[in-house]
Amino acid sequence: MPNQGEDCYFYFYSTCAKGDSCPFRHCEAALGNETVCTLWQEGRCFRQVCRFRHMEIDKKRSEIPCYWENQPVGCQKLNCAFHHTRSRYVDGLFLPPSKTVLPTVPESQEEEVKTSQLTVQQSKLSVQSNPSPQLRSVMKVESSENVPSPTHPPVVINAADDDEDDDDQFSEEGDESKTPALQPSPDVHNGLRVASARKPGVSLKQGECLNFGIKTLEEIKSKKMKEKSKKQGEGSSGVSSVLQQPQPNPGPEKENVRTVVRMVTLSSKPEEPLVRLSLSERLGKRKLSVGGDSDPPLKRSLAQRLGKKVESPETNIDKAPKKERGHKAGEIHVKTLEEILLERASQKRGELQTKLKAEEPSGADDSPSGTKSSSSVRIKTFSEVLAEKKHRQQEMERQKSKKDTSCLTLTDDTEMKKTVSLPTVAVSKGQPEEPAGRARSMQEVHIKTLEEIKLEKALRVQQSSESSGNSRPQAEAAPGTKRLLRITKRAGVKEEKKCGLEDSGDPPQSSVTKMEANETSDETISDPTKLAVNRCDTVKEKHTQRLQERGASQKEKAALSSVRGDEASSYTRVAGKPVLTAVSGVTRHLAKRLPVESSQKGEVETSGIGDSILNVKCAAQTLEKRSKVKPKVNVKPSVVKVVSAPKLAPKRKAVEMHSAVIAAVKPLSSSSVLQESPTKKAAVAVVPLLSEDKPVTMSETENPKDSSVLSSAQAASEPLLPEGSGPSSSQTATKPRRLSSASTGKPPLSVEDDFEKLIWEISGGKLEAEIDLDPGKDEDDLLLELSEMIDS
């Protein structure tokens, strides 16, 4: 048993249930002894068995009567330190009564009995707790024998304070005696000014009630209610500040509401508005259904359930609570100037929103505001209600179709930013006419918004640019010979971009299939996009007619010498100034239309056509780069950038265009060309193919604008092509990739020599310096640089 350290209180004066696990000292020799060990007090008692107590003893327990002696069982402790008046038997041993005499004062005896009972009860209660709090509790109990219980004095002090508060505020608050003591605490801690501000108002009301009578009190309360409703209505949201502030500390607010209800018991009428007001505030959004004005909120909730996004819910919430509070405060509600202005503003907003139904959020706001204003003015007929329902259904279908088409285009394209711009432009072509007509039929005056004006301007610019783009290529196409646009340094960037866009144009065979694919895809596209695609179809038809007319005259030239001579002559002719000015004008015009053009080019580059063109160009470039001693390969198939082709001579560009067109139209013929190249017949094989497809390439170089518009239309309709056209495009995409990888092996020397000679003859022994384009630059950055160069 532990015999070191301090004594265990329960072992010596009660029963310790811990036994050996008790960290305090259990010593049988010291049982019943009340003498403190002096060595232990000095901290140097190291005896194994010490008969003295290792514990501070403040009381004479021999003078305290034993609690268990008065119990029916009696005291069963052999060494009990308390006073026993009767003799007892413990384990067969006879123990005589205690020799010490108790003090003579009977009152003190009773107190000692009580304290002894307290100690025993506390010892029983805290048997399982740690011994250090045991000692503290014992010391507290022993020291507080003659002191009254600690809970009593604070009660006395609080009562006195309450009495003083009652004396101070009796004239103002009457029965309220305890709320003043509780009121300041929320004011100090939480800053709940609303709660405290409400209370002085109530006290003033009661003071006036005492002085002037009940009628004036009712009038004052009705005025206060009106003021409160105005203040709460002026808040930014329908929920008032009284609701928002008490949330961090709900306790004081509840008590405050209770006091207000108790105050109002003098007059029965104003009690109901107060309670209803707090309930409607706590209900939040549902409070709209509490008032009598329930029809507009129901329609608003229907519009919200149908999935429309409501743009300004706060203002709608504002208006209904104001009406409610007005009806509740008094039977007759006089509208204030602010309310009338707000209603007019809401009606104007509703008119504007009906005209802006092309946009989703405004269209969603339109139905609730319009119905609300009309319901406040007049009752609608049944036919009008039916017309409105049909109108809403049409709007919803239109929005769904828009969302479907935009989602399809977004999922097909890899770069999100570039793809978003084109569908919006295409949609805006057909969109503004229908909603404007509808809005005019509904309301007389049509006020154009800024967005509508911008859309119309963009449409005008686009149409003018398309018409000018059509006229310029026709002017350039007057001479029947094939032209190679060649501009040094400045317009080279734009030319390479145009080459990339022209490659996407197809010869007559593929254009027919593309038109069929466009027609099938038109069925899936919604109304606005049909207009843009149909326009592009008409452009394509004109294009193919022109090609067929020119094809008859151009097929006669089939020899390699004639091709070379034509190219050389056209090269020298193009080096002149008029063509250069025309191209610079085109580029300048393009620079003006940067937002529309860049979005269309982004669409072209990221669509499936772009991939096939790039793969074809890879195949063509690998053939051409054999002629170089140190080829620079800078082609990234994952990111489709037509601009990133390395330095090429003028003839190389022409060859690249021809080979790309051949590969795009006839993958088998291009593969045959590439397979014949190891047998030293590349130059001979290329000639007939070039002569056959010459009208195509010529017309493409002559109408750069048409090809850009056409390719943008193809790119717009490409993600929605049917399954029939899918394999053909994938064929053209996969075959050149394989061929290019195969053809990058060991090139024969004869093919290289042929290319070297051809290029050297055309360039006249001088390869002009070309622009080295940074492949990391974006399409928009290059266009900006081009426009700056042209302006300077």
From Swiss-Prot:
Segments forming a coiled coil: 338-360
Modified residues (Phosphoserine): 108, 132, 149, 171, 289, 346
Composition skew (Basic and acidic residues), residue ranges: 308-331, 345-360, 393-405, 431-443, 492-501, 545-558
Zinc finger motifs (C3H1-type), residue ranges: 2-29, 31-57, 60-87
Keyword Iron attached: no
Keyword Transport: yes
Disruption phenotype: Homozygous knockout animals show embryonic lethality by 6.5 dpc. Homozygous embryos at expected Mendelian rates are seen at 4.5 dpc. Heterozygous mice do not show any overt phenotype.
Recorded GO CC terms: nuclear speck
Bias-annotated ranges (Polar residues): 115-135, 461-473, 698-715
InterPro entries (UniProt xref): Znf-CCCH_3, Znf_CCCH
PROSITE patterns: ZF_C3H1
Biased composition (Low complexity): 367-376, 717-730
Chain segments carrying region Disordered: 103-191, 223-331, 345-443, 458-531, 545-571, 690-750
Crosslink feature (Glycyl lysine isopeptide (Lys-Gly) (interchain with G-Cter in SUMO2)) location: 114, 124, 140, 454, 601
Pfam families from the UniProt entry: zf-CCCH_3
GO BP: any one term: poly(A)+ mRNA export from nucleus
Assigned keywords, A-Z: Coiled coil, Isopeptide bond, Metal-binding, mRNA transport, Nucleus, Phosphoprotein, Repeat, Transport, Ubl conjugation, Zinc, Zinc-finger
Ranges of compositional bias, category Acidic residues: 160-175
Entry function: Through its association with TREX complex components, may participate in the export and post-transcriptional coordination of selected mRNA transcripts, including those required to maintain the metabolic processes in embryonic cells. Binds RNA.
Oligomeric form and interacting partners: Interacts with TREX complex components THOC2, DDX39 and POLDIP3; the interactions are ATP-dependent. Interacts with PABPN1; this interaction retains ZC3H11A in nuclear speckles. Interacts with KPNA3.
Record-given protein name: Zinc finger CCCH domain-containing protein 11A
Species per Swiss-Prot/TrEMBL record: Mus musculus
